[in-house]
Amino acid sequence: MNAKVRLQLSAMMFLQFFVWGAWYVTAPNYLGTIGFTAGDIGWTYAVGPIAAIISPFFVGMIADRFFAAQHVMAAMHLLGGVLMFVAAGMMKGGSSPGSINFMIFLSQLTYYPTLAMSNTLAMKNIADTERDFPSIRVLGTIGWIIAGFALSWLGWSTQINMFYLAAVTGILLGLFSLSLPHTPPTQTGKVTAG
């Protein structure tokens, strides 16, 4: 396997899960300090799976037919990073938990499709997936772990900075995605409903 492609895909996986790990585990530590109840925090975690159910119907249908995967990945992460910045700004500005959770929902609508997309990008650019994919994918797990360590080391596990870290990393991954190997759409033609 080409060393440059391996490095690109490994970095993509690392950043993909760093974005998520930067806020997902420690969010209640901060949200509780700005007035979120246990129910509000429950909704913070419920909106992600709801987004995961909804987003493939739109992003998947369009991405698989009309756009290169790396371009969709870039757009999703850039938009998701901006939405996470907005959510953090709403937290800082004292917005209601419901409106903050709605903004997190919007950011997750852009994030969840990229989980499958990152695997697609990796699989389509690896000659021997059985041999090479595990060593690339494990960098995602390492990215998640390093995000947690970074929050602890920086003292951010109870601060709004975790959301800013996720936002900045998402935007960086969006920009980095533009350098990933070209991965054209797998299908062509009109989008149909059935």
Model-derived regions, located:
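Helix-to-loop junctions at the C-terminal end of transmembrane segments
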Residues: I54-A68, L154-W156
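Hydrophobic core of transmembrane alpha-helices in multi-pass small-molecule transporters
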Residues: F14, L83, S95-M117, L121
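Juxtamembrane intracellular "pre-TM" segments in multi-pass secondary transporters
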Residues: M1-K4, L178-G194
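Symmetry-related core transmembrane helices of the 12-TM Major Facilitator Superfamily/SLC fold
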Residues: A147, M162-S179
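Residue-level signature of mid-helix packing/kink "hotspots" within the transmembrane helices
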Residues: P49-F57, W144-I145, F149
